[in-house]
Amino acid sequence: MMREKNREHYKKRRDKSGVKKDGRMQMKNNNKGSVSIYIILIFAVLLSFILLIVEGARKNAIRLKTECAMDLSMSSALGEYNRELLEQYELFFIDTSYGKKQASIDHTAEHIKGYLTDNFEASDQMSKDLLGLVAEQVLITDYSLASDENGALLKKQAVDYMKDLYGVSYAKEFKKQLDEVNEKGLFTLDVSAIQGASQSEIDSYPLPKKKVTDKDGDHWEDVRLDNPADAVNATRGIISLVLPAETEISTAAINPSNYLSGRNCNTGSGLAGRTALKSTDEPVFNEYILKKSGNYAFPKDNSELKYEMEYILHGKSSDIDNLKATITQLLFLREASNYIFLCASPQRCSEAEILADSVSLAALSPELKEPIKQTILCAWAYAESVYDVRKLLEGGKIPLMKDDESWHYSLDSMFGYATDAMEEDLSAGAGMDYTDYLRLYLMLKDSEIKTKRFMNVVEMDVRRTTGNSYFRLDCCVDSIEAEALISSTYGANYTISRSIAYSE
């Protein structure tokens, strides 16, 4: 009995001991499960945070690369300036025809898009593109053209170039020459009109008659007035007398409707807030035109018109007509200058007066002494002017106002001026050359007219070069503003806008 009780007691204790052991094991397993869930939750939060950081970094990288790529693409677009325009005229403009027949600003947009695509490509083919950027579309939202505001942007680049090259002080000297011309009235003093008025007075005067006896008996005849100045004055307007011997005149001609001033031009936004040129910049632009354009005395190689400066001044369609108009202008100015000198020279006035006195007395009309004297002075001034212009055309120099030393013809020798040969050294002496005289007239020319004609000349000469047959200045861009739509294969779209220009 005692043994059975002990066994039962022992069994109960063993059962109780087993229960406690199983409980501890169960609690231990529950603790392990709680830790695992906690770690998973922490890892999920950390992973989300890491992914958020990675995505933020990706967005920043996309933004940075987009901005850099856009800036590079815009600069690359400006790098496609027309090479001939730079080489011949030192001007930076994008020719939106890109050597093709049809020009369009859309071509520039496509070029920018192409540069964006190149900039977005991975530099290493083995590397993974973590940004996935694609240039979906590029639009040009604003642009300025060379022809805008009557060539304001072309003039601005030209003036900046000249200021960098020479400064601005040199242009002031030319202004002094123009002031002297205006002060003395060389642009307005019409010697031909003086000669015409004097000749009309002579022609309207009733010459006396004289009694003549011959084999038929006595009869009355009109007294003849033999004025030696008539032979010189009769040659006025004969341009061939001015041209140097054996001169070959250019026969080149253009169709004005083929160039900028003869068509309706495309328009852009112009200066668009950029600093406009001042009135003091106009002489600088004149010097640019003179530097980049040829003329009769100093021609430019490979030009459509051989006498470009003459065309800019007169706008006629042929070299011959422009040269004639220029020679007429130069004769007018030189004749005025020479007439003023003769009238101010006591010695030469006295010579003309003595000759006029003898002519009028021979005609029994002493009242005509003064008008005859004026015709002699006008003829003398004209003969000297023909010599002057002939020398200028051959590359020589003539002072604006002559003195005794620089005066060429005596009263006797001026009657043979038409057959006079240019034998002296053209490089000798001081004064102004042919281009200097053209400068005077260029300074007087209306700014809009001369700018348009110069732009015509630019188009003429650039079109002569390979790949520029359809070149047009109103299709040449100085500044652009572009907007690009960028997408990412990771699900984001971006829009970026940039502007860039050659001139500020």
Predicted regions: what is each one?
Residues 1-2, 376:
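Short intrinsically disordered, low-complexity coil segments enriched in acidic
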Residues 83, 91-504:
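Long, compositionally biased low-complexity segments
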Residues 3-104:
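Alpha-helical assembly-interface signal, strongest on the long, hydrophobic N-terminal helix that forms
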